[in-house]
Structure formats: structure tokens, C-alpha cells
Amino acid sequence: MPELKIKTEKVEKQLTKEPLVLKTPKEKIDNLGKFYATGKRKNAIARVWLKVGKGKIVVNKKTIAQYFPSETYVKTILKPFVLTKTIDQYDIICTVRGGGISGQKGAILHGISKALDKSAPDFHAILRKGGLLTRDSRVVERKKYGQRKARKKTQFSKR
């Protein structure tokens, strides 16, 4: 019984301490008025700067049409602007590293969505409902020894 009393006294002391005050993080806005966010997908990491402009999109010092050969990639990257009805209202500058084209596309999409969310809090519900603010955490499964691929096995013979 004395051990239980000591433990309850410790818990009571912890409860009577002053509550922790959580600091709200500062919005990532630089001195030029750009909203900054990072996006990730597979092995790709994108750094995105968003500012009010005319709809110009630059990826690694190239236009989006030069960087992504397929038009479907461009359409998916512009999805946050279509949902929020802000096409041609923001200029985007982004740098992307790692992964392939599909992973880089997903990273840019995630970064743009996060930057748009910071620029106007009204967009949060729209972007969340569209599933653009959640990171797609799917990555390639590793190859196991004794198998041909991650899941594919060699042909089994009973005899």
C-alpha cells in the first residue's frame, strides 16, 4: 500500500503543474511574400514557393511543359488550382529532387496543395476533401532473398 500512495502523490504533482502552452508555428512566408511548402512522394522531395501572379509554373528552371512531357502530368499538378478555382492567380517556383517523373509529379502536387493551404485557410476543407493534403506514403516493397521479386516466388515442385 505505501508504494501505491507514493505513485499517486507523483501523479497528483504532475497534474497540478502548469499546463503546457503550445506555440503556434509561424507561417512559412519569406520576405518577398512567397508561401513555402515541401511535398514528398516515394523518393522525391519538392520544395515549392507560391506567390500571387499570372499562373506561371517553373520546375527546376524549366517550364512545366518542358519538364513534364505528358499533358496528364500537368493536369494532375494543376488539380489544386482547379478545386480551389484559382487557376492563373498564383506563380509557382519549385525544385524537385530524387525519384522518377511520377514521384516528382506527386511531390509537386503535395507541395502546391500545402502552400495553397497556407496562403488561404479557406482552402483547407476543399483540399482536405480532395485528398491533396495527405502524404501518399506508399513506397516500393523490398525484394526478399530466395524470391524473384518482393512477392513473386520461384515455381514450386512437389516431386
Swiss-Prot record:
InterPro entries: Ribosomal_Su5_D2-typ_SF (IPR020568), Ribosomal_uS9 (IPR000754), Ribosomal_uS9_bac/plastid (IPR023035), Ribosomal_uS9_CS (IPR020574), Ribsml_uS5_D2-typ_fold_subgr (IPR014721)
Gene of this entry: rpsI
Classification via HAMAP family: Ribosomal_uS9_B
Cellular-component GO terms for this entry: cytosolic small ribosomal subunit
Pfam families documented for this protein: Ribosomal_S9
Similarity remark: Belongs to the universal ribosomal protein uS9 family.
Keywords: Ribonucleoprotein, Ribosomal protein
Full protein name: Small ribosomal subunit protein uS9
Molecular function terms, GO-annotated: RNA binding; structural constituent of ribosome
Entries under SUPFAM superfamilies matching the protein: Ribosomal protein S5 domain 2-like
Domain of life: Bacteria
Residues making up the signal peptide according to the UniProt record: none
Any Gene Ontology biological process: translation
